[in-house]
Amino acid sequence: MKNYKGYLIDLDGTMYLGTDEIDGAAQFIDYLNNHQIPHLYVTNNSTKTPEEVTQKLKEMNIDAKPEEVVTSALATANYISDEKSDATVYMLGGNGLRTALTEAGLTVKDDENVDYVAIGLDENVTYEKLAVATLAVRKGARFISTNPDVSIPKERGFLPGNGAITSVVSVSTGQAPQFIGKPEPVIMDIALDILKLDKSDVAMVGDLYDTDIMSGINVGVDTIHVQTGVTTYEELKEKDQQPTYSFKDLNVAISELEKNAQK
């Protein structure tokens, strides 16, 4: 395995599995920290703030800082702010998205007379919220969605994800949204801009082929698949585009890096 100068790292299925630690995850981050190798956590989760994400990582014995976290909510706020710094936004979503939008200097409104509609995972979604979002898009608001995941793994099983909620507005208006999160290039380009490294020196690490691995492939960075989450090695072998590497877990990645260091 190549020694990269920076890493973009997925969370659920890579750093932890729900509320369980994944063997090798904390050790991999310790290795990066000890060797002063920059890395960012890139997540499609829009409900949490970077501080909340960091707190969960610390509970998993992973040493992380809020400034190392790029959520789809942060990327969405960044994207809108770059297009129109004084934009008004109608949003569906949680505290993570609302905080990101307001901290970016954007105005969150509760009616359909807005510049943008931003949809993130909203566990308290109602018909009225979807109705206002639909009316706003029909009136010409730019239609943004934090991430396309149609289902999310929870303790009860796979539940509707943000892509499922977004599809209601999309089907009703006949308009496709601009998705921000993985596997779209938007969130990856923002993360790469923060790292300020050549793409050839960066690897994307993740478990889920359709989001994590494809996000790396879509922006032209190497990819490291870990067999600790959703996509199994057997499923991976059936894919047309293969990751650069696939490891049983991140302990194997550490061993590979240590071998290179001894050469």
UniProtKB/Swiss-Prot annotation:
Gene3D superfamilies: HAD superfamily/HAD-like. One of its GO terms (cellular component) is cytoplasm. The keyword ATP-binding does not apply. It comes from the Bacteria. One of its GO terms (molecular function) is metal ion binding. Pfam families: Hydrolase_6, Hydrolase_like. InterPro entries: HAD-like_sf, HAD-SF_hydro_IIA, HAD-SF_hydro_IIA_hyp1, HAD_sf. Its EC number is 3.1.3.-. Coiled coil: none annotated. Its cofactor is Mg(2+). Keywords: Hydrolase, Magnesium, Metal-binding. PANTHER family: 4-NITROPHENYLPHOSPHATASE-RELATED, HALOACID DEHALOGENASE-LIKE HYDROLASE DOMAIN-CONTAINING PROTEIN 2. Belongs to the HAD-like hydrolase superfamily. NagD family. NCBIfam families: HAD-SF-IIA, HAD-SF-IIA-hyp2. Catalyzes the dephosphorylation of 2-6 carbon acid sugars in vitro. This is Acid sugar phosphatase. The lineage of its organism: Bacteria, Bacillati, Bacillota, Bacilli, Bacillales.
